[in-house]
Amino acid sequence: VNLMITMSKDKQAAMNKEHIQQGTPAFKKANFALFAAGFITFANLYITQPLLPIFTKEFHVTPTMASLSLSLTTLSLAFGLLIFGSLSEAWGRKNIMSICIVIASLLTLVVAFSPSFKLLLMLRIIQGFAFAGIPSIAMAYLGEEIEGRSLGVAMGLYISGNSIGGLAGRVLMGTITDLVSWTAGMILLGSISLIACVYFMWALPPSKHFVSQPLALRPLFRSLMSHLKDPVLVSLFLIAFFLMGSFVTVFNYLGFKLTEPPYYLSMTIIGWIFLVYLVGTFSSTWFGILADRYGRPLLILTGTVLMLCGVLLTLPIPIFYKLIGIVIFTFGFFGAHSVASGLVSRHATHDIAQASSLYLFAYYLGSSVGGATGGVFWSLFGWSGVTSFTIGLLIISLLLVLRVKKLSKA
C-alpha cells in the first residue's frame, strides 16, 4: 500500500512538472505573452471611445453614428467569441490566437488611413471579430498549460493586461489626438501592437496538453439550449447585457457632454478621465471577498444600486459632482460584473466554459446595443436623456437581480 501511495505521489509530481509552474522561466514567458495579448486586445478594441466627438466633426456624422465605431466592433466580437472557442478545440490554441492578434493589430494601422466613415466601420467590424480569438481562447490555454496552484496568479495577470490595455488605449488616444491627431494615435498604437505581437508569438510556449477534438455541433447546441433553459443563468446573462449597456452608454456620451459649455474640456483631459477604471480593479476584488460572506446576489444588487446613485450624481451642472458620480458608477459596475460572472461559473452544472462564453456574449451585445441606442437619447434629450435611459436599464437589472436572489441558493 505504501509503495502504491509513493508511486501515486511520484506520478502526481511528474504531472505537475509537465505543467508550467510559478517561478519558472516558462511561467514568466507565458504570462508576459498573454499579458501582452490582453493589453493589445483591449487597447485597440476601445480605441475609438474617446474619439467619438472628433468623428462627428471630421466625418460629419451624428453621435449615434459615431458610436457605431465601438458598438459594431463589440457586436462582431460578441459573435466571434461563440465561434473561436469551438474552432480552437479543433485547430489549436496558439495558432488561432497568433493569427487573430496579427490581423487585428494590422487593421488598426489601416483604420488610421480610412478615407470615409463607412470604410472605418467595415474595418472595425472585421477587427472586432479578429480580436475575439484572444479572450475566448486565452483562458482555455491557461487552464490547460498552467499548474493548478499557479493558475490563480496567471489568470490575474492576464485579466490585469485586459484592464490596463483598455485604460492605456483610451488615455493614449486622447493625449495624442490633442497633441497631433487621432490618425497619429492609431499609427502609434498599431505599431506598438505589432511589436507586442512578435513578442507574443515568440514567448508563448506551445501547447503541450491540448488534445484536438473534431467539431461536434449537435452536442454544442444541446448544451447551449440547456443553459438557456436555466432561469438563473438567463437572468445573469440579461444582467450582463443591461449593466454593460448602461456602462458603455455613460462613457460613450460623457465625452460629448464635457466638450460642451460650460466645461470645454480637451481630448487629453477626457482621455485621462478613464483613469477612474482603476477603482474597478479594487471593487472587483473587494466585492469578490464580500460575496463569499454575504452572498453573490446581494453584492450584485449593491453594485447596481451604486451605479444608480452614481448616474444621479452626474445630473447637477458642477463638474465635481459629475466626476464623483462617475467614480461611484464605475466602482459599482466592476463590482457587480465580477460577482455576476463568477456566479455563472458557480451555478452552471456542466459545460461551464460555454456558460461563461454566453455571459460574455450578452455582455458585449449589451455594449453594442446600449451604446448605439444611448446615442438616440443623447441627440434628442442631451445628458438628461442619457441618464434616463441608463436609469431604465439599471432598474431592469435590479429586478433581474431580485429574481436571481429568489431562485438561486448562492
Q: Regions from the language model: what does each represent?
A:
Residues 96-109, 298-312, 391:
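Structural signature of the two symmetry-related core transmembrane helices
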Residues 16-24, 205-237:
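Juxtamembrane intracellular "pre-TM" segments in multi-pass secondary transporters
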Residues 103, 107-110, 118-126, 320-328:
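Paired small-residue
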Residues 123-164:
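Cytoplasmic helix-loop-helix junction between adjacent transmembrane helices
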Residues 79-118:
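Conserved MFS/SLC helix-loop-helix module at the cytosolic interface between two early adjacent transmembrane helices
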Residues 119, 148, 157-204:
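Helix-loop-helix hairpin linking two adjacent transmembrane segments in secondary transporters
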Residues 60, 92, 113-119, 130, ...:
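Helix-breaking motifs and short loop linkers at transmembrane-helix boundaries and internal kinks
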Residues 297-340:
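C-terminal transmembrane helical hairpin of 12-TM major facilitator-type secondary transporters
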